[in-house]
Amino acid sequence: MEAFAVAIQSVINDSGFLAFTTYNAIMILVGLILLYLAFAREFEPLLLGPIAFGCVLANIPRNGFEEGVMALISAGISQEIFPPLIFLGVGAMTDFGPLIANPKTLLLGAAAQIGVFVALGGAMMLGFTAQEAAAIGIIGGADGPTSIYLATKLAPHLLGAIAVAAYSYMSLVPLIQPPVMKLFTTQKEREIVMEQLREVTRFEKIVFPIVATIFISLLLPSITSLLGMLMLGNLFRESGVTDRLSDTSQNALINTVTIFLATGTGLTMSAEHFLSLETIKIILLGLFAFICGTAGGVLFGKLMSLVDGGKTNPLIGSAGVSAVPMAARVSQVVGAKANPANFLLMHAMGPNVAGVIGTAVAAGTMLAMLSNH
């Protein structure tokens, strides 16, 4: 009987209830709210769902996650394994044809990155270090894997807040972008019908990822792992002889890695790291960055329309953020409401895929500037 009592006492002493705090309860509530948004409201459920559940797990006291499979999942993020693998799948799902057919849309993808650098300056004004500000600013590119990659390198203690902000704003693209697009364009500009894009050859689609990888990687070696995997996935897609690799990359692989990446991100959302004034600042700065990025793309689209005599609909500029393909769909929806004869989707895909490259380049630029500081 005494042995039984000792065993019961041991279970009680090891119980998480004894170490459970109000802060743990608050973070578990945050996780449950995110689960509701993911599954009931369908806000980026494939990503926000695992992140939310990881948040719940991270706030169970004495969870023993320092070893075992959870430690391996965390290592996949800290050792920068998962983001490049996500990019492999993204590359296999991406068609660079609209960008190749209309190369000037690359400039729209670049213009949309203004939000990244505006937010960087704003974050530094609010007291964040240069490294922290850079990691926060990249939220404006609306690219979750790149945000995680840069945060891991420059501000790992802010990873949870940055990832949640990035994926939240990606899911809210249809709500955030239209008011900004309408604010900076006239009805006449939104009604512009663009000419059909030319057909892109298979040779062009194969050469593009090779040339882009070599040139950009030589310019910014720090993003070679991200960009290289993106373009390798695209080569699988376009080569015509690696269908099995392409299918695996854009289905089984990316789905599996998404589970680990999102869950691992949630595991960083422990109360001691997440419950702070900095988290609120990060969420607000991320929203500001995303709005500025959308505005930057639209304003550059207006300039492009002015230069080419009204052949470019400025609405496609908002797709310069790298939320693929949601941002391009928003351009299509807003354009079609202004003019039912408008079909902007393929035109918007040009700046949209350019935004993926642009956000990676912005991340590489900041890494080159700050990694040694």
Q: What is each residue range found by the language model?
A:
Residues L99-L120, A271-G297, A348-N352:
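Entry/N-cap segments of selected transmembrane alpha helices
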Residues N59-L72, L88-I100, G122-Q131, E272:
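Transmembrane alpha-helix boundary signature
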Residues V6-A19, L37-R41, F53-I81, L235-T256, ...:
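Hydrophobic transmembrane alpha-helices of multi-pass solute/ion transporters
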Residues H157-L175, L285-G293, I316-A319:
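Alpha-helical transmembrane segments
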Residues T213-F300:
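Transmembrane helical segments that form the transport core of multi-pass membrane transport proteins
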Residues F39-L48, V69-I73, M93-L108, T242-N251, ...:
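Interfacial helix-loop-helix linkers and transmembrane-helix boundary segments
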Residues S168-V241:
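Membrane-embedded hairpin module used as a gating/binding unit in multi-pass transport
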Residues A75, Q79-E80, L88-M93, L108-V118, ...:
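Alpha-helical membrane segments and immediately flanking helix-loop junctions
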